[in-house]
Amino acid sequence: MNLSKINTLLIASFFLFLTATVISHPQASFEASKTGLSMWWEVVFPSLLPFFILSELLIGFGIVRFVGVLLEPFMRPIFRVPGVGGFVLAMGMASGNPAGAKLTARLRQENQISRVEAERLASFTNSSNPLFIFGAVAVGFFQNASLGILLASAHYLGNLAVGLTMRSYGRKEEQHLRRKKTIPFPSVKDALHALHTARLAEKRPLGKILGDAVTSSVQTLLMVGGFIILFSVFNRLLSVVQLTDVLSVFTKGALTLFQLPTQLDIPLLSGMFEITLGSKLVSETDVSLLQKAIIVSFILGFSGFSVQAQVAGILSETDIRFKPFFIARLLQGVYAAVFVMLLWKPLYTAWHDPYQYVFKSLNSSDMSTAFINGWNLLVQIGPAVTLCALFTYIIIFSYRLTNGTKKG
């Protein structure tokens, strides 16, 4: 039996097992589905939709090309990606997973970047957003806003470290391309010219651009929601059928190798599937805060198989390969964990110096309140935003379907 047939058999067996487990444990599957749906409905959809729509509009109106010309002298020498990568990096950090992959795929579809450049770009522009790191993890799970500064710093430095590491990726594939020896200093005139050229090349009317931005964004988020629910169910079923204990042998071995407490084996395994659940379980473990921070930082950097599956689904619409992205997630997990250890004293221990107690208490309290209020507001208005967006999507889709039928 060749490797291809073995691969097919393994995939078929896995999904057969998953289906049988769902049927045999309907209550656990239902509860896990509700948990995943609630997360998508209340938080993921409303937090990502505005960024997705605005990004589509910025690409459609040529503003991304304007930014790209200005950032070319910085992004090209440092990360070996075009200037538009700076826009993707900023939007990816602000909005969170999987925005970086979504924007990278769009730029590749627009032929603004090569395949190798897209693979480099996707590797370091996907990250958790600050609201999740501070509001959900630091304040929500650990009740410690100061920890958010450490986790966010390590997370985003890990992103940049991955970008620097991946800049050497694909050199052989680019040997045939002729690159300019010197990159000119950014010119506003050239940037405006690129903006105008891109706008003239866009033949769609304003209404069509707006409609496409909404429908494309909603369709992507529907797919993201499906993956969140699927992995929520899968993670729960692993625990129900006690496979978690079997798989935790690997995480326990890794923890022992790095001299970390083996009590973190189940939380680490859960986090490798879904970051929210894993981070919550880590916060409840009875080990030192530094050890918890190291594992949570790795989980945030690795992003979890749930997010990686979302990214794989997005990248599958292009010729961008998933393997470099997966390797980059492993690297970011390791880098982020190392940065936590390096920054522990300057960013956390020093912040909790007893001589700085008054300053610490004031800022920590204000920060906690701000992020708690922000997170609670998102959860409160999230369902309404999701419902309105889905209603708008249905109207646009129905209108286009009706017009298409009439023309046919």
UniProtKB/Swiss-Prot annotation:
On whether Lipid metabolism is a keyword of this UniProt record, the answer is: no
Q: Where is the signal peptide?
A: none
Q: Which UniProt keywords apply?
A: Cell membrane, Membrane, Sporulation, Transmembrane, Transmembrane helix
Question: Could you give a single Gene Ontology term from the biological process aspect?
Answer: sporulation resulting in formation of a cellular spore
User: Taxonomically, which superkingdom?
Assistant: Bacteria
Compartmental location: Cell membrane
Tell me yes or no: is Membrane among this UniProt entry's keywords: yes
- Which chain regions cross the lipid bilayer? 6-26, 43-63, 81-101, 131-151, 214-234, 294-314, 324-344, 377-397
Induction info reads: Expression is controlled by a sigma-E-regulated promoter which needs the sigma-E factor for the binding of the RNA polymerase and subsequent transcription.
The cellular component terms of Gene Ontology attached to this UniProt record, alphabetical and capped at eight, are: plasma membrane
Q: How does it sit in the membrane?
A: Multi-pass membrane protein
What is this protein's function?
Required for spore cortex formation.
Please identify the protein, giving its name as recorded. Sporulation integral membrane protein YlbJ
